[in-house]
Swiss-Prot record:
Residues bound to Ca(2+) 4: D130, D132, D134, Q136, E141
Gene3D superfamilies: EF-hand
N-acetylalanine modifications at: A2
Physiological role: Calmodulin mediates the control of a large number of enzymes, ion channels and other proteins by Ca(2+). Among the enzymes to be stimulated by the calmodulin-Ca(2+) complex are a number of protein kinases and phosphatases.
Gene name linked to the record: PCM1
Protein name: Calmodulin-1
RNA-binding among keywords: no
GO annotations of cellular component type: cytoplasm
Length: 149
C-alpha cells in the first residue's frame, strides 16, 4: 500500500509524523493520530480514527510506528473524497473566510502545527502557490498546489 506513495508524499508524512513523535522513539500515541492526520488535510471522524487505530496498532500497545502510519495514510488517501477534503483544508488556512490565504494566515496555521517558519519561508510558500501574483493564495491556486504534490 505505502509503495503507491511518491517520495515527496513519504517525506511529507515523515515530517508530520516527526512533529508528533515528541521523544523521537519512532512511535506516536494513538490519540495523536487524529492531530497528525488533520495537519495533513485529512478530516477523520472519531469512529474512523478508532477503526484505523485498530487496524494499525497490531500489537495493541497504544502506539503506531512510521511504517504502520504510512500504510494507514496510503489507505486513507486512496478513499478520500478529495474535493471535500481540499475545501476543508482550505477553510483551516483561510481564517477570515475571505477566500484567500494570506501570509499571516499561513504562518498562523504552520505555527499551530509546530512549524516555526521565518517570514522568508512563509513568503516563499505563498510565492510558489500564487499563480496570479496577488500576494495571497486563492482556492484554485491552493487546489493546484495540493494536487501537484
Amino acid at each position: 500500500m505505502a509503495e503507491q506513495l511518491t517520495e515527496e508524499q513519504i517525506a511529507e508524512f515523515k515530517e508530520a509524523f516527526s512533529l508528533f513523535d515528541k521523544d523521537g522513539d519512532g512511535c506516536i500515541t494513538t490519540k495523536e493520530l487524529g492531530t497528525v492526520m488533520r495537519s495533513l488535510g485529512q478530516n477523520p471522524t472519531e469512529a474512523e480514527l478508532q477503526d484505523m487505530i485498530s487496524e494499525a496498532d497490531a500489537d495493541q500497545n497504544g502506539t503506531i510506528d512510521f511504517p504502520e502510519f504510512l500504510n494507514l495514510m496510503a489507505r486513507k488517501m486512496k478513499d478520500t473524497d478529495s474535493e471535500e477534503e481540499l475545501k476543508e483544508a482550505f477553510k483551516v488556512f483561510d481564517k477570515d473566510q475571505n477566500g484567500f490565504i494570506s501570509a499571516a494566515e499561513l504562518r498562523h496555521v504552520m505555527t499551530n502545527l509546530g512549524e516555526k517558519l521565518t517570514d522568508e519561508e512563509v513568503d516563499e510558500m505563498i510565492r510558489e502557490a500564487d499563480i496570479d501574483g496577488d500576494g495571497q493564495v486563492n482556492y484554485e491556486e491552493f487546489v493546484r498546489m495540493m494536487l501537484a504534490k
